[in-house]
Structures are given as C-alpha cells and as structure tokens.
C-alpha cells in the first residue's frame, strides 16, 4: 500500500490547486473510486468544486473529509525544489500540500481500496467529502455540500477529517473539536474638532477606552473538560486623521472571540452590548460568525481512531481542541461524531512543506484500521 499511497500523493501534489482551483484532483479521486462501486456527485458553486462520493446505502456511514486546495507557495526561489514538483529527499516528501492535506487524501483512497479488497462484505457505507475551498473564504465549499446533504436527508454517522493534527510524531494528537470564531467590527462615534478646543468636540478614543479595558479584562467563561476558557482580543484599531491637532470623529476596532462550548454566540453578543451600552457609547457593531464550536466526546469514533493509532504507532493519542477552525464545524451539523486526524503539522503553509515518507504508509494503515474498527 505504501507505494500506491506515495504515488497518489505525488500525483495530487503535482496539481497546482491554489484556492479555489481544484485542477483535476477530485476527478482523479473520483475515477479511482468508481471501479469500487462509488457513486459520485460533483457539486460546483461559483468557482469552487466539491465532490461527494459514496458506496453503499446502509448505516453506519463513515465519511472521510478533506480539501484539495492549497495556500500560495510564497517565494518559489526560497524552496529547495519546485513546490508543485513533488520530490522525495532524505526520507521526506516535499511539495505544497504534502502535509496539508494531499497525503491525507491519498491515504483515504488507498485505505478504502485495501479495506474493500480485504472485506468486500463489510457492513455500512463509506463516503468522501472533498472541497477546493477550505483554505479560502470557505463559503462555497463544505458548508454548501452539507446543506445539500441536509436537504435530501443524508446524514453521516462518523466523520474523519484529514487535517494535519500531529505535533511531534504521527499519532500523538486527535482533534475532537474546535473552538468557535466570532468577530466584531466596532465603530465608536464622537465629534471631530480642534484639539485646542476639546469642549467643542467629543473624543471617541477617550470615551471608548474604559469599555475596551473592561472587555479585555472580562472572564467570559472558564472553559470545560475539553476546551480552554473563551478569549477576546483586538486585532486592529484605528482612529484619527494622522494630524496631531485634530480630535477624531470616530474610532474603529476589529476584535475576535475564540469561544468554547461553555458560551454561546448569543451570550457573548449580549455581554458585549451590555458593556458598551453601560459606558454610554454611541456605536455601531457588525458581527460575523465564522463557525460555532463543535465537540465529539470520547466515544465510538474517537476510540476507533485511537485504537488504530495504537496498533500502528504504539502511541496513545491525546484528544485536543486547540488550533483554528476547520471544515469540521460545518460537518458537525449533520454528524454527531467528527474528529480530525492527519500527519504532522510542523511545515504546513511554510516554505519546503513536507511529510515523512514513512508516515505516508502508516497514515493509510491507520485509516484502514479505523474502517475495520467501525464497519466490521
């Protein structure tokens, strides 16, 4: 299986699938699985290509999910080899997307192939959900596929997202949830004027400062068994004309919550508005929800992946909810058990992105054993 997985990973890396361009990756996967009896549904929204392909109609349905798009390479001259010409060097496979996440996609496919070859009469069903819009806006990708599946009543029992989750070695980390992300665009209005005549103006920086300080010091929640406490941080702040003798007419702040299941979107919004209102600010606040938190407590899926990891690596994986958002947040709407597991993430989005060649086969074997743990 290792040569097959490595070869497929190299074929995928060679495709210049910069968001939202899939560059033929999904067709390659679709054609490979067609011979196994998979029925495919290509869903295009705008410039984004998505693939939903499934074999079987019985429960439980095990889904592998991932993305074919990759981030820009950065200066190509800083790479030791062309980022879209996959190279094996010193025991590592180099190329853009090697870790995030074309090796996982290749491992999905070869794991499924070997599982079906070994167990043609397995119970349940197997599916893949793949998008070319995970690294970008993520508005025409997985979220749209999930909406389509909801419309036709198609639910997933177990989903493994192939994001690169491991830190020091393959098998050390499973992501069993992610924090939510809620952003705010806050404008506090004052009255512009000459700085020598402050009685004829109202400085929004001065009026907003106490409220900003309170927001920064607020304990939003204490987290829980799976999540750290919710955080609130300012990412951008701007006020003034650039002159030293003008009191600005308004101040603008961009802020972001990374929040746990101990808080809700509505509770966070309400507390922010309460603080701003109590300080008597004249303001406008526009909210943007990038994703709600999701959590899969230890259970059937986490145990199945953990057992497969132990068998292949001898490592007891840690369950973690750290890091940014992923497409798991969308899939959680139609699947009660979602986890993420993939290769090491030390080089993702970096120059000379790579994955250890030995991990390519081991990752495919972990995915195949997970299928055995769930469908036999």
UniProtKB/Swiss-Prot annotation:
Coiled-coil boundaries: none
Q: Which pathway does the record list?
A: Amino-acid biosynthesis; L-lysine biosynthesis via DAP pathway; LL-2,6-diaminopimelate from (S)-tetrahydrodipicolinate (succinylase route): step 3/3
**Cross-referenced Pfam families:** M20_dimer, Peptidase_M20
Tell me which cofactor or cofactors this protein depends on: Zn(2+); Co(2+)
Question: A GO term (biological process) for this protein?
Answer: diaminopimelate biosynthetic process
Q: Which UniProt keywords apply?
A: Amino-acid biosynthesis, Cobalt, Diaminopimelate biosynthesis, Hydrolase, Lysine biosynthesis, Metal-binding, Zinc
Q: What remark does the entry make about the cofactor?
A: Binds 2 Zn(2+) or Co(2+) ions per subunit.
Q: Which reaction does it catalyse?
A: N-succinyl-(2S,6S)-2,6-diaminopimelate + H2O = (2S,6S)-2,6-diaminopimelate + succinate
The record lists Zn(2+) 2 as bound by 100, 135, 349
Q: Where is the active site?
A: 69, 134 (proton acceptor)
GO molecular function annotation: acetylornithine deacetylase activity; cobalt ion binding; succinyl-diaminopimelate desuccinylase activity; zinc ion binding
Identify the residues that bind Zn(2+) 1: 67, 100, 163
Q: Which Gene3D superfamilies match?
A: Zn peptidases
Q: What is its EC number?
A: 3.5.1.18
Top-level division of the source organism's lineage: Bacteria
Describe the function of this protein: Catalyzes the hydrolysis of N-succinyl-L,L-diaminopimelic acid (SDAP), forming succinate and LL-2,6-diaminopimelate (DAP), an intermediate involved in the bacterial biosynthesis of lysine and meso-diaminopimelic acid, an essential component of bacterial cell walls.
Q: What is annotated about its quaternary structure and interactions?
A: Homodimer.
Q: Which NCBIfam families match?
A: dapE_proteo, PRK13009.1
Q: Of which family is this protein a member?
A: Belongs to the peptidase M20A family. DapE subfamily.
| UniProt protein name | Succinyl-diaminopimelate desuccinylase
């Amino acid at each position: 299986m290792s040569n097959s997985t490595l070869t497929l990973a190299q074929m995928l890396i060679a495709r210049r699938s910069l968001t939202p361009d899939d560059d033929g990756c999904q067709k390659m996967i679709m054609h490979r699985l067609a011979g196994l009896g998979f029925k495919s549904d290509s869903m295009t929204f705008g410039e984004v290509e998505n693939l939903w392909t499934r074999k079987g109609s019985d429960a439980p349905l095990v889904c592998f999910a991932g993305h074919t798009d990759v981030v820009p390479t950065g200066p190509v001259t800083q790479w030791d080899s062309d980022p879209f010409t996959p190279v094996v060097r010193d025991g590592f496979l180099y190329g853009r997307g090697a870790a995030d996440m074309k090796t996982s996609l290749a491992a999905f496919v070869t794991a499924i192939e070997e599982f079906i070859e070994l167990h043609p009469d397995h119970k349940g069903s197997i599916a893949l959900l793949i998008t070319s819009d995970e690294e970008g806006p993520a508005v025409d990708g997985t979220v749209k596929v999930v909406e389509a599946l909801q419309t036709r009543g198609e639910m997933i029992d177990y989903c493994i997202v192939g994001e690169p989750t491991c830190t020091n070695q393959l098998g050390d980390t499973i992501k069993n949830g992610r924090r939510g992300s809620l952003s705010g665009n806050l404008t506090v209005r004052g009255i512009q004027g000459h700085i020598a005549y402050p009685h004829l103006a109202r400085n929004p920086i001065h009026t907003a400062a106490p409220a900003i300080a309170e927001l920064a010091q607020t304990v939003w929640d204490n987290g829980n068994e799976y999540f750290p406490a919710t955080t609130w941080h300012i990412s951008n702040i701007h006020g003034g004309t650039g002159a030293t003798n003008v009191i600005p007419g308004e101040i603008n702040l961009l802020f972001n919550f990374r929040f746990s299941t101990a808080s809700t979107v509505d509770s966070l919004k309400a507390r922010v508005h309460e603080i701003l209102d109590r300080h008597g600010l004249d303001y406008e606040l526009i909210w943007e929800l990038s994703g709600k938190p999701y959590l899969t407590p230890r259970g059937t899926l986490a145990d199945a992946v953990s057992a497969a990891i132990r068998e292949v690596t001898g490592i007891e994986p840690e369950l973690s909810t750290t890091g940014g958002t992923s497409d798991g947040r969308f899939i959680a709407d139609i699947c009660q058990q979602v986890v993420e597991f993939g290769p090491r993430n030390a080089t993702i989005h970096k120059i000379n992105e790579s994955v250890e060649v030995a991990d390519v086969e081991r990752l495919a074997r972990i995915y195949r054993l997970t299928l055995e743990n769930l469908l036999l």
